[in-house]
A protein has these predicted regions:
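Conserved NTP-binding catalytic cores of kinases and kinase-like/nucleotidyltransferase enzymes
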Residues: 1-85, 205-209, 319-324
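ATP/Mg2+ or Mg2+-diphosphate-binding catalytic cores
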Residues: 154-155, 283-324
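All-alpha amphipathic helical-bundle segments outside canonical DNA-binding/catalytic cores
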Residues: 264-276
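An alpha-helical support segment within catalytic cores of ATP-dependent transferases
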Residues: 7-18, 137-139, 152-194, 198, ...
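Active-site acidic catalytic loop and adjacent metal/ATP-binding pocket
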Residues: 31-44, 49-50, 81-84, 177-228
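A cross-family kinase active-site recognition segment
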Residues: 112-166, 187-189, 299-302
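ATP-binding pocket architecture of kinase catalytic cores
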Residues: 43-137
Length: 324
């Protein structure tokens, strides 16, 4: 959550009033993330997150915001966007010439050192999210899927050493081969989160009282295979951050909980190793892009691309499948 566009209290207050959210009390910039401008805002009625979208357009945003609304209405703990009090009640707003949204701030905290119980809770809720999205009527492609990889790899290759370049080229060729297979075409699809990392989930309590209070930051969502979404999550929740190696206990907890809600089909089970590599490639590539071709922003904290290079090498050399 970088800050590309500065918003003053005087600029934020009228928007909050127009949404019926009360009088602004304070506003504070969020420093995490890299895509959009985010502020925590408190009013006399509650706590919210104000987002100004720096890349997504007014035409693209309804997919994301209405998806959040749809999921919230179907029992998934997601912060629903607030609509204007005017006739029509739009949920995409304008602030400082940019599209904006306001959502409730979730209760709880992120768990940056998850245990198996956290991974099981995420796996369970991700499966419920996938099922809840089956009847979502809007479709929009995952904007960071294979077509984007094919476009972006040539842009980042000049910044890589020869060994990294060989890995990048060979993995991209492999993923294009996988995507052309009949097994890949048979994968179940629907809206995915696309970025369900440790810092995009909130929890309360511990032990037997542990409770997942919400998923957030859906702005990399899109229409894609559910297996890709699972793989992105496994590559963050269930790996050792220092080595990139899989933590088998956490992975089994995640997949077991997911499958208790939605069992994987045969093609998903066979392609999980390939999709784990795909998830690692996607974030290695996007982090290289953000590092070497940055945008100007206050509080910008670029993520280390080396982490997902390590994950990709681990996934390629030590394929991990579905337990049982």
């Amino acid at each position: 959550m970088a800050v590309y566009t500065e918003v003053s209290p005087a600029e934020a207050a009228p928007l909050l009033l127009s949404l019926g959210l009360g009088q602004l009390q304070d506003i504070a910039a969020c420093s995490g993330g890299i895509e959009n401008t985010n502020y925590f805002v408190n009013t006399d009625q509650g706590s919210y997150v104000l987002t100004l979208f720096e890349r997504l357009t007014f035409e693209q945003l309804p997919f994301y915001l209405h998806l959040m609304k749809h999921l919230a209405q179907n029992g998934v703990p997601v912060p629903a966007p607030h609509a204007a009090l005017t006739p029509g009640g739009g949920i995409v707003h304008m602030l400082k010439g940019k599209p904006a949204s306001v959502v409730d701030r979730l209760q709880g905290r992120s768990e940056l050192a998850p245990r198996s119980a956290h991974c099981a809770a995420v796996g369970d809720m991700l499966a419920r999210m996938h099922l809840a999205g089956r009847d979502y009527p809007r479709q929009q492609a995952n904007l960071r899927a294979l077509p984007w990889w094919n476009e972006t790899v040539p842009v980042v290759l000049p910044y890589l050493n020869p060994d990294q370049s060989r890995l990048m080229r060979s993995e991209l060729a492999y993923q294009n081969h996988v995507a052309a297979s009949s097994a890949y075409q048979a994968l179940p699809r629907g809206p995915i989160h696309g970025d369900l990392f440790r810092d995009n989930v909130m929890f309360e309590g511990s032990g037997d009282s542990l409770r997942l209070t919400g998923f957030f930051d859906f702005y990399f969502a899109g229409w894609d295979s559910w297996l890709f979404d699972i793989s992105v999550s496994l590559n963050d929740w269930c790996v050792d951050l220092s080595t990139g190696a899989e933590d088998s206990a956490r992975a089994q907890a995640f997949l077991g909980a997911y499958q208790s809600v939605r069992p994987l089909i045969a093609q998903e089970r066979s392609l999980l190793p390939a999709m784990l590599r795909a998830g690692a490639l996607r974030f290695w590539l996007s982090r290289l892009w953000d590092l070497h071709l940055p945008r100007e922003a206050e509080l910008l904290q670029a993520h280390d691309p080396g982490h997902f290079e390590r994950v990709l090498r681990q996934r390629a050399s030590h394929p991990c499948g579905v337990p049982g």
